[in-house]
Amino acid sequence: MTMGDMKTPDFDDLLAAFDIPDMVDPKAAIESGHDDHESHIKQNAHVDDDSHTPSSSDVGVSVIVKNVRNIDSSEGVEKDGHNPTGNGLHNGFLTASSLDSYGKDGAKSLKGDTPASEVTLKDPAFSQFSPISSAEEFEDDEKIEVDDPPDKEEARAGFRSNVLTGSAPQQDFDKLKALGGENSSKTGVSTSGHTDKNKVKREAESNSITLSVYEPFKVRKAEDKLKENSEKMLESRVLDGKPSSEKSDSGIAAAASSKTKPSSKLSSCIAAIAALSAKKAASDSCKEPVANSREASPLPKEVNDSPKAADKSPESQNLIDGTKKASLKPSDSPRSVSSENSSKGSPSSPVGSTPAIPKVRIKTIKTSSGEIKRTVTRVLPEVDLDSGKKPSEQAASVMASVTSLLSSSASATVLSSPPRAPLQTAMVTSAVSSAELTPKQVTIKPVATAFLPVSAVKTAGSQVINLKLANNTTVKATVISAASVQSASSAIIKAANAIQQQTVVVPASSLANAKLVPKTVHLANLNLLPQGAQATSELRQVLTKPQQQIKQAIINAAASQPPKKVSRVQVVSSLQSSVVEAFNKVLSSVNPVPVYTPNLSPPANAGITLPMRGYKCLECGDAFALEKSLSQHYDRRSVRIEVTCNHCTKNLVFYNKCSLLSHARGHKEKGVVMQCSHLILKPVPADQMIVPPSSNTAASTLQSSVGAATHTVPKVQPGIAGAVISAPASTPMSPAMPLDEDPSKLCRHSLKCLECNEVFQDEPSLATHFQHAADTSGQQMKKHPCRQCDKSFSSSHSLCRHNRIKHKGIRKVYACSHCPDSRRTFTKRLMLERHIQLMHGIKDPDVKELSDDAGDVTNDEEEEAEIKEDAKVPSPKRKLEEPVLEFRPPRGAITQPLKKLKINVFKVHKCAVCGFTTENLLQFHEHIPQHRSDGSSHQCRECGLCYTSHGSLARHLFIVHKLKEPQPVSKQNGAGEDSQQENKPSPEDEAAEGAASDRKCKVCAKTFETEAALNTHMRTHGMAFIKSKRMSSAEK
């Protein structure tokens, strides 16, 4: 039955709806936890708009009772004494929204608009928050709470009455009536004698002691305003015929909360409590009229108006359904609704000061006369029929090992906070009130959070403290400073803000076993949803197994959590934090030694050239005059730094800070910031800090680990005892002296270098010059050295190019004595020999006689080597000149067009049309005319092909036959008298043409003014003509 379906239920239905349920289905609670929490946020926001009171996001007071049922709300909550408000409040903190709802309902009841049942339906839904566990302060899945043992309910009940209303709740009031028999005739309630006056007295003492906690926090000004408001509200309610101490007190709380701001929530709550305690006597006097007026209140009006409240608080229906279901089996479980559902929203709860809900059974009977009789029966702890476990086994599932979180500011606040005594008093009060109860009823929620006295924490570092629970059980808790929580989420940071209220948060895993502090902590159970029976049994096993098994059970319990509800917050342990701090200290530490600046002005006679600022270390700023000193600087051993570079994916070992930073600089130059892990710092023994140099010679010290990489091949001179090590040009070196034991063997008459004519001042300088020069010029000699400089090349073509570019073509030239043009020269003797063989028909020319010996700087051996080289690898120019052989034998296969004009008598002419071949040119010219279809067509005299235009024929001759211009063609019979002379170039014609022939197009016979215009014109004929032009120009 939903709230929308409620028509006019009987009064018994409403009373039964608010019976205390024994158990809430954990699955249902898990499914609806998120939505319920969102609906709470919306309700809180609605209350804020009406009453201008901040929602429950602010940090509440440090000690407020947990699981307070809405005993101080108006008559609907107390109708049957069974409050589902265990659901309503979490960890003993009454939410601001709940107080606001009191204020709203109180105001409405003054006006007579809203019946008391509206408060009955609204308060359970609104009371599911605590001032500390607001939706804004913590995220939905990151809550911490402790379900306190049910043994402390007696003290909690009395404490609730003072904190919230200043008067005893109706349920306790019924107990008092049953014990004292004072008001039983007025209320008509039959009582059961399961409590005695000692318990009542103890409750009263607990109330008074607990209220004394807040004495130092009283605010006088707020107290006076609260007193005035309470008096006005009491008077108005008495006039309306509804005098209710619960209404007046809730109105006072609402008035207090409506006048406060988020920053003053704590002080306003304390002031409200103080004012309510001052009104205790007036509230007690109003109890009996409240009960009588509630019984006499008309039912239909309450029921008709109640759906309005139900619309505002959809959570109430879930509570009613759960309570009705639980009322069918009132003796099943001593657990209350809040013990399961309170895990939804509360991040913290006081262990030492807040007892649990009493296990009672209230039986409501409506007599025929219309009177209501209720019987309150104390239910002893029994085995839970739903889960089959005792209350001590009802602990929720284990969270993954959660260490205590303390922010640094919170630690300072804890150390300097004055109210130590009130917190200790609160803990003592809880312990005394539950002294007679069995310690088996202690239940621990998934993430237990205890509010410890300030004296429990003395330092901000990691330590183990003893925590005494309310059942006289002492456990060890590990407190770790906030330095290890640098990567925590915003929820953890907000939790640390809540800690600043003079409390210390200790998770339940630390309570279970203080030695389990893993490196990486996954706060898997911060969702605080009711857990299943499997996880509950695992916690029970954890508490009884050895430490090794505890760790495994914790991992299994964490794995059983719903994956979508797990908050993946990784907390860096203190060990990792110390490593990171050490690494940062190494990288950011200031060098205590001042920056070293060398003397960069050597004597003038030393002949040493130094950089402007020396060889400077980019990491520490030290500068050195010698590059060897800089290499030794990077090789020094001061500390062993072993680190894993994530970019290089390898373990690296550095022996000083500069080498590590230099490696990081290499990554930075590539645009990547160096990331490293597994840092290990080890001191270097004093005997290993200085690496002894080698015992060879003074110069051999240059063979250091860094400098050796740039050194060339060592050269050993046979007459010297030690090896002379050639160093880089930038590194000054001392020569190996003396050069010879006997000075008479030294063929030196002055301090002048015979190679470069440089004069030196002393023998060491000259020796250094020679050794240094040998180092620079001691490169590997290639096959073709240049005689003009110290370079060498692997091929003769590279050498020729080098001579042509660097030495302006200074080279021995060969001129042909048979050619009339003296400008025809050759750069190689082989080319001259081939020229004479091809052009002049001399088989064995004497090149030595023909060569120009003027300025000859080469020898015959080089020329012979070049001839052999050229014979193996012919040059591109030689390839073009080879087909011009005059006495070359004819080709065996004449199946392709002739690519070059062959000037020989053995030429075979082939008809391209029919394939006729002959060596007689006249016979060939007599054959080809028969293939000419038209007398006006242009026929090629070389192959017999016909073309329609002279340009096409000229193009064919130029490309295929390499002829510069077409031959005269006979139109009649194709045979001319001078047909044999056409293939021979005329020397007279070539001379006549002169310079104009160079600018004439060989394809279309056009003449151009410049060579550039001709080259541009050749592009119109295509690449084939351009290549032909280049080849023809190369032949010259």
From Swiss-Prot:
The modification N6-acetyllysine is found at residue 175. Pfam families: zf-C2H2_11 (PF16622), zf-C2H2_6 (PF13912), zf-C2H2_ZNF592 (PF25412). One of its GO terms (cellular component) is nucleus. There is a cross-link at residues 458, 515, 879, 902 (Glycyl lysine isopeptide (Lys-Gly) (interchain with G-Cter in SUMO2)). GO terms for molecular function: DNA binding; zinc ion binding. Gene3D superfamilies: Classic Zinc Finger (3.30.160.60). Residues 182-193 have a biased composition (Polar residues). A zinc finger (C2H2-type) spans 615-634, 751-775, 784-807, 814-840, 938-961, 999-1021. Residues 26-92, 106-206, 220-265, 281-362, 847-877, 966-1000 are annotated as: Disordered. May be involved in transcriptional regulation. Belongs to the krueppel C2H2-type zinc-finger protein family. This is Zinc finger protein 532. The gene is Znf532.
